[in-house]
């Protein structure tokens, strides 16, 4: 039985690697949503801190960075270029397909001409001739899927996009998209206490698709005193969010978490999770408690909707 332990090193490469198409990246990435203003809108309050955080990424061996044209909008992509261009040794993934109308307001738009504009503008802001990984942020229910997927396939064929990913999708969504292009990544909600995307994760494992969980640090009520999460946290002198993140990493070899922040100290705290090794016994206990919390969440959602 493996022993639960924590390394003192702050190095994303401790998490191992995962393939995203033909690209191999360290399995601890970074989500650049938080280097913006409140409500993921406008410029950040402390731009210098955000730039310093972004510049720290390659020093910690983080080589997969996820952003979106809607973060700001445009702000996140612009800051990435300012801090890290020409991205030596880095894979920059971005997303498109959402319209912003204000803070915390997001609306799907899958019109083919709009998607093409999104790709071209992201290329311009990032200063690249090809986007490493472009992800459809949301499938637009008001636009025929054939139109959305065909346009994405065309842009890939033209060389504007190297690889294609999807976000917030079902297994059936992935299978439908795969009729038009290879899907190399899926970005869905997943964490210790929210398992609604287990079937999607299983499909990704079968197909060798990188699974990018958003909101990977969540631990809900398990962060309270007396839980196994609390006990492991105290034993290793690590935060409950670090333990929750280490559980996500160990849940599957295709997992590629991208915790984000606008501060260097928080970034380093997150990366330390890459050096935590949970024993099989501790992992199983966390898994069991997490499933229990997820069941409670689902029950509460049913009550609210009834």
Swiss-Prot record:
Coiled-coil segments on the chain, per record: none
Major place of residence: cytoplasm
Annotated region (Disordered), positions in chain: 287-306
Organism: Schizosaccharomyces pombe (strain 972 / ATCC 24843) (Fission yeast)
GO cellular component: cytoplasm; cytosol; nucleus
Record's keyword terms, sorted: Cytoplasm, Nucleus, Oxidoreductase
Subcellular location(s) per record: Cytoplasm; Nucleus
Pfam families, per database record: Aldo_ket_red (PF00248)
CDD domains: AKR_AKR13B1
Protein name as it appears in the record: Uncharacterized oxidoreductase C215.11c
EC number: 1.-.-.-
GO MF term set: aldo-keto reductase (NADPH) activity
Family label: Belongs to the aldo/keto reductase family.
Superkingdom field: Eukaryota
């Amino acid at each position: 039985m493996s022993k639960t332990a924590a390394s003192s090193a702050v190095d994303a490469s401790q998490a191992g690697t995962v393939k995203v198409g033909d690209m191999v990246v360290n399995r601890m990435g970074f989500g650049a949503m938080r280097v913006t203003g409140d409500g993921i809108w406008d410029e950040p309050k402390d731009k210098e801190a955000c730039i310093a955080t972004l510049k720290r990424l390659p020093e910690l061996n983080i080589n997969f960075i996820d952003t979106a044209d809607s973060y700001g909008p445009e702000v996140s992509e612009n800051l990435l270029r300012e801090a890290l261009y020409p991205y030596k040794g880095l894979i920059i993934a971005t997303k498109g397909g959402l319209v912003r109308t204000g803070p915390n307001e997001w609306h799907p738009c899958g019109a083919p001409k709009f998607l093409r504009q999104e790709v071209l503008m992201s290329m311009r802001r990032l200063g690249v001739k090809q986007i490493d990984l472009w992800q459809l942020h949301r499938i637009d229910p008001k636009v025929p899927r054939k139109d959305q997927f065909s346009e994405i396939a065309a842009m890939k064929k033209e060389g504007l996009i190297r690889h294609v990913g999807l976000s917030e999708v079902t297994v059936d969504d992935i299978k439908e998209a795969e009729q038009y292009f290879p899907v190399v990544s899926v970005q869905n909600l997943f964490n210790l206490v929210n398992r609604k995307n287990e079937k999607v994760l299983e499909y990704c494992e079968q197909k060798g698709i990188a699974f990018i969980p958003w909101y990977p640090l969540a631990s809900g009520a398990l962060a309270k005193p007396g839980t196994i999460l609390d006990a492991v946290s105290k034993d290793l002198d690590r935060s409950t969010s670090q333990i929750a993140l280490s559980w996500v990493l160990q849940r599957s070899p295709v997992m590629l978490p991208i915790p984000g922040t606008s501060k260097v100290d928080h970034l380093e705290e997150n990366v330390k999770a890459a050096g935590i090794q949970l024993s099989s016994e501790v992992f199983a206990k966390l898994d069991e408690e997490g499933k229990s919390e997820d069941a409670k969440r689902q029950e509460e959602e049913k009550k609210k909707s009834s």
